[in-house]
Amino acid sequence: MSETANWQPSAAIANLLKRATILAEIRRFFADRGVLEVETPAMGQFTVTDIQLFSFQTEFVGPGAADGMTLYLMTSPEYHMKRLLAAGSGPIYQLGRCFRNEEAGRYHNPEFTMLEWYRPHYDMYRLMNEVDDLLQQILDCESAESLSYQQAFLRYLDIDPLSAEKEKLREIAAKLDLSNIADIEEDRDTLLQLLFAVGVEPHIGTEKPTFIYHFPASQASLAEISKEDHRVAERFEVYFKGVELANGFRELTDSHEQCQRFERDNRKRAALGLPVRPIDENLIGALKQGMPECAGVALGVDRLVMLALGAEKLSDVMAFSITKA
């Protein structure tokens, strides 16, 4: 073994002690509100179809799987937790490890801790209020402000994202010195995401957390489409100090619509040369059985701890980041 082996933790022990205190505080927050802590598999037979997410894949070759069984490390506990909701669990939360085969850096690590919770009979706004309560308790920050996706674009880019044509989006991109990317991009949502990341995100959540809600319906993911305005989805994200902290939905409960969205994702995957994913029939079965109307949110715990401690990067609050794993 090399005498210079870098064996020490990524984070200072003092930071890990503070992290443990925050995790205990999160658990108290939900215990006080009667929300049940659950544990679901870190590996499963199905994974997400979302073209923006990349899973780790492995093969199980134990007894009963001589030909191999493809398994995926979970990018989120969402599908399993929804099956619990359909089985009658009531309100639930989970603090668990998730895995994404994507980037590693200041705000990203392939293995990370996710806080995810679901509230039957909550709408999007009521869940946003609960997220705000948690952030105030953990971060000792002001109450959050809220802007619709449309309001944010109008305020910072003077453009309506729900009606603007692709050519108009490219014009705005040019003003942000993004022509080299935008001019060859044909997907409207990718253009919107580019403008949001460069033209909106730097301006929001600087002094207090900011909720952005009512994303375009084309970016609904697993959220319901708004009954008041079919152009938007009942989806929100939370930003603070340059960091995206959470992503929440009023959850889609229609099994047929969910199956159609999975199939649409797979068509996009095929067009992009990405692997087509098997549709999670267990989730579809749970939705057919009847998952209660609910709202749910996923929050990055490592990022939350980083902000709470005033740290500069995730590795400052993780025992061993990927470079030391």
Curated annotation (Swiss-Prot):
Q: Mind telling me which InterPro entries this protein's record contains?
A: Aa-tRNA-synt_II, aa-tRNA-synth_II, aa-tRNA-synth_II/BPL/LPL, EpmA, Lys-tRNA-synth_II_C
Tell me which residues bind ATP.
100-102, 109, 244-245, 300
Q: Name one GO biological process term.
A: lysyl-tRNA aminoacylation
One of the entry's Gene Ontology molecular-function terms is: ATP binding
Q: Name one GO cellular component term.
A: cytosol
Q: Name one Pfam family in it.
A: tRNA-synt_2
Q: Which reaction does it catalyse?
A: D-beta-lysine + L-lysyl-[protein] + ATP = N(6)-((3R)-3,6-diaminohexanoyl)-L-lysyl-[protein] + AMP + diphosphate + H(+)
Binding positions for substrate per the UniProt entry: 76-78, 118, 251
E.C. no: 6.3.2.-
Going by the UniProt record, its keywords in alphabetical order are: ATP-binding, Ligase, Nucleotide-binding
Listed as disulfide-bonded, the cysteine pairs are: none
State the source organism's domain of life.
Answer: Bacteria
Subunit annotation: Homodimer.
What is stated as this protein's family in its record?
Belongs to the class-II aminoacyl-tRNA synthetase family. EpmA subfamily.
Q: Per its database record, what is this protein's job?
A: With EpmB is involved in the beta-lysylation step of the post-translational modification of translation elongation factor P (EF-P). Catalyzes the ATP-dependent activation of (R)-beta-lysine produced by EpmB, forming a lysyl-adenylate, from which the beta-lysyl moiety is then transferred to the epsilon-amino group of a conserved specific lysine residue in EF-P.
Name listed for the protein in its UniProt record: Elongation factor P--(R)-beta-lysine ligase
Organism field? Photorhabdus laumondii subsp. laumondii (strain DSM 15139 / CIP 105565 / TT01)
